[in-house]
Amino acid sequence: MNQQNQKISNPQTPVPTTSEMNDRDFVNELLTTEKYMTTAYCTALHEFSHESLYQDIQSIFDESQKAQRKLYDLMFQYGWYSVEAEDSQKLQQSYQKFQQTIQQQSPYQQ
């Protein structure tokens, strides 16, 4: 099965093409901001030593991650976000290569 260059998406919901921001622009801006915020929270989580503060930021990170996913789902639903299908054979080859690398680097080899 050759799935190369196939887009996975929904029909695009039309938006006005004016110089003003439209719904797609606003949602895209929110998604970009959430991606930035989750990256920043993730970095902070790696560096916190204070447990209570760590737990607070972990909670905020989780909320931000959920918001990011909801925004992605919304954009995908309206056809404003698409992904490319990958050939299943390429996926299998990548997976096998990854498994070999893990086995070679494992300190628990038999």
From Swiss-Prot:
This is Uncharacterized protein YusN. InterPro entries: Spore_coat_CotF-like. Residues 1-24 are annotated as: Disordered. It comes from Bacillus subtilis (strain 168). Residues 1-20 have a biased composition (Polar residues). It comes from the Bacteria.
